[in-house]
Amino acid sequence: ELSVALYRHLLGLPEGEGSRDEPGAGQDLNLLCCDIDAELIERARSSSPFPASISFAQLDIMDSGAREPLLSSHLRRFGRAAFDIGFCMSVTMWIHLNHGDSGLVAFLAFLASLCRYLLVEPQPWKCYRAAARRLRRLGRNDFDHFRSLAIHGDMAARITEILTKDCAMDLVCCFGSTSWDRSLLLFKAKGWNPEDREPLERGCD
């Protein structure tokens, strides 16, 4: 599971080592992992070696009525107004295809308003075309918004433009490409420093 591997990586724990309750496992790192797939979440929850530190929740992130109470409650548990970092891995395309240009912008605005740092792995445009082809081969209709998307082409550049120009974030680093030819982009909230614990009041203009 990516979430467990990420937790181990952030704490420098070797594969297969212990649990969250063991000394040295890291007392201040807690992850909240969300996915729309309830079965996937249940499987991850039942197999997690760090149940005290990694929380799993089934969530449609585009459902504001569901996300607000869940995320606010999680932050209150730790007396925080925002997440230190958000990881958005291979998600942007699905948000974009199912909710259109406005949905993608709203999604990025929401993440920017709630995260001090944000690591994004945008799927390139060729993945959009491949997803549409797979759907057609299955005899199903195109994604509702695929043919009407005005945000297209170099998706890493377009997402960077949205976050930096409209959502009060700075691009800190591009970590190159993954084995799937996807960029890893790290953004930081403008004007924030590690000592700042005040609420973030930001979003896309």
What is each of the regions a protein language model found here?
Residues 87:
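A conserved beta-strand element that flanks and buttresses the S-adenosyl-L-methionine
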Residues 30-35:
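Conserved SAM-binding motif I beta-strand of class I
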Residues 1-26:
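Conserved SAM-binding loop of SAM-dependent methyltransferases across substrates and taxa
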Residues 50-70:
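Conserved SAM-binding strand-loop segment of SAM-dependent methyltransferases
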Residues 67-72, 94-110, 114:
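A short, conserved alpha-helix within the catalytic core of class I
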Residues 109, 131-177, 185:
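Conserved Class I S-adenosyl-L-methionine
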Residues 44-45:
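Conserved SAM-binding loop
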Residues 108-129:
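Conserved beta-strand signature within the Rossmann-like core of class I S-adenosyl-L-methionine
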